[in-house]
UniProtKB/Swiss-Prot annotation:
Gene Ontology, cellular component aspect: extracellular region
Signal peptide range: 1-22
Pfam families, per the entry: Cecropin
Chain positions listed as propeptide in the UniProt record: 23-26
Family: Belongs to the cecropin family.
Function in brief: Has antibacterial activity.
A Gene Ontology biological process term: defense response to Gram-positive bacterium
Positions of post-translational Leucine amide modification: 61
Subcellular location: Secreted
Keyword terms of this UniProt record: Amidation, Antibiotic, Antimicrobial, Immunity, Innate immunity, Secreted, Signal
Record-given protein name: Hyphancin-3F
Length: 63
């Protein structure tokens, strides 16, 4: 009997907390920041590609 009351209380708290939203979608901001960091890394690799190729060619000429 006590276990069912505790389970019901926990479930009621979960439902109450899940239905309340204080700010518009605050949990997605963390994922957007991670996505932005990944995008910046990808763009940096794309921009550095030609420079790395030139360094590789220069190293090949030096041998």
């Amino acid at each position: 009997m006590n276990f069912s009351r505790i389970l019901f209380f926990v479930f009621a708290c979960f439902v109450a907390l899940a239905s309340v939203s204080a700010a518009p979608e605050p949990r997605w901001k963390v994922f957007k920041k991670i996505e932005k960091v990944g995008r910046n890394i990808r763009d940096g690799v794309i921009k550095a590609g030609p420079a790395i190729a030139v360094v590789g060619q220069a190293k090949a000429l030096g041998k």
